[in-house]
């Protein structure tokens, strides 16, 4: 374990004293460091009447138990403090460590001992081996009572709300859209978990089309075949118009108003970051949206109709939209329990809706936590004029996702009433996505949130993984860079895949969100400042660093070679079939120079930290009137790399007081032969830009530029890079087995590493 503490807020000795005393620690500004430490440690043993016995079972140094130390006249030293602090944090001498000084240094222990109360204050805010901070562990053990009111420590809310006596209610919010065109504004189901209190509370809202269930069997039937010809597209320019996202004014006329919801629920799937804050006084709201189980409308999949329907829930929390107690629309109900302040949460589609909601500039949305979210749907399903499936899902497209999330059809009565109209709508959508050509068009433009980044007012927190080939890093990169310069924004850029990071051992992400939520939603003047970019170092285990930005302008140029080389697109049928059935076998062969590719190896002559988009400038020609080029950059070398999927450790992370416990996780640091750094794909007809389609003349040289997926990746002098240039990618692109070649003039081609 390593400590990476970004949530602690430095305080004055007076504040440290006041907060420690308020929690029942009998410390004094006049007492010695040793006396205060003894009082602190004795308080830790909440379940012991005889704390002497507990102290006797701990040690102050290899020769002295802790009780004997406190009874002696020896002063408290950094060594004793450190050894006892380790035991307080759950580490066991002679098991987890033998040399406490070396162990503390290896773990980057964040507290510099000076004997002050600030040391004890920071120790409470430090994570234990279980993943909980020491103060959260003690509160879960009833250090302070459940009060159903806010208690803050170090600018963060503690788990003082009763999660056994929550309000669990359902309302149906009236949206400003009629997506199924039945003449009625669509209602969306809102599932609410909130503390049982008599004062207004803020809310964490998760907009998830998956929340009420999915229609996987129907979606699987629509999965597209990836085998086919790369078509020649007519040359020309693509024209677009700016989407209109203005909603009509809401009708706020009450109808037989009531103050109590009539629908309850026993269980719903939740996000543990929401659970963590629910125990700390923030309501948790889940909204599936239009076209989902027990909501109305059709699934419009990423357009601003879908977004405005989610926005209506935030409007309802602020008195600007109506909600009904049931879909019969007989009684309206107001959110009289809500303060109106909201943060959105969730990963993938959920993070996508966070991005989209932020661009509406809706009042009340104070903060957005967008985890691995899409910022432009074209960049999820397409790339540079090509069909490019999200990693791990070849053959998926927006029509299959629409079918997957249209859970309204799981209700047989709804299926009976609406399926015919829905299928007509889905057929139209399937045409609009244009799988034939892979070009950007108005359909995709209507689902590009980046163009409205200037409307964002909320504080934005992003998380994204360098190994996320599902929602690829271009999505966070372009949104992060497009936001107004005056806006407060933050990015946690880790080395995982498409994964949550709130339960990781190495970083206090949820505590950082607690501090920020208290500041933005509860109005707590805690002085908390979160760095702009927090990056997980790819060369070390559990190591995080602060960076100034994502994307740098400096570039190191690497000439690709001195000759020409060719890529054969065609495979023998047996190999082509094998790769199509198991794309991982293609990747294995590709990276080991066993597939159709140009493989180029380079040894770095300097240390470099890639930060941004690796750029390829290639001089190429195709033997036919079409073609595509794919590229991947890898670090080669048999050594330890961070694996992309977090491994569970133990079921030790508590989100309240024995509430919604979950497994602690971390990216394993494992031996491997290589690590993919970045990748990219380009249709040669889109070599100029995304909106320009040009002819490809057979055997005529072209200069193309290809920006690969953005990343942050550290390399040392002597490290070996491998650039692989190829055509068909069996995981991502159309599988065209035509017999043509792409030739690259390596002497006129280069790779630029941004740093």
From Swiss-Prot:
What domain of life does the native source organism fall in? Bacteria
Subcellular location(s) per record: Cytoplasm
Assigned EC number: 3.4.14.11
**Where does the protein principally reside?**
cytoplasm
Q: Does the keyword Hydrolase apply?
A: yes
Q: What residues make up the catalytic site?
A: 348 (charge relay system), 468 (charge relay system), 498 (charge relay system)
Q: Which Gene3D superfamilies match?
A: 1.10.246.70, alpha/beta hydrolase, Galactose-binding domain-like
- Gene Ontology CC annotation, any one: cytoplasm
**What is one GO biological process annotated to this record?**
proteolysis
Recorded catalytic reaction(s): these are:
Hydrolyzes Xaa-Pro-|- bonds to release unblocked, N-terminal dipeptides from substrates including Ala-Pro-|-p-nitroanilide and (sequentially) Tyr-Pro-|-Phe-Pro-|-Gly-Pro-|-Ile
**What are the record keywords, sorted?**
Aminopeptidase, Cytoplasm, Hydrolase, Protease, Serine protease
One Pfam family linked to the record: Peptidase_S15
- NCBIfam families, sorted: PRK05371.1-4
Q: What family does this belong to?
A: Belongs to the peptidase S15 family.
Q: What does this protein do?
A: Removes N-terminal dipeptides sequentially from polypeptides having unsubstituted N-termini provided that the penultimate residue is proline.
User: HAMAP family attached here?
Assistant: Aminopeptidase_S15 (MF_00698)
Q: Could you give the subunit structure recorded for this chain?
A: Homodimer.
What name is this protein filed under? Xaa-Pro dipeptidyl-peptidase
Organism listed in the record: Streptococcus thermophilus (strain CNRZ 1066)
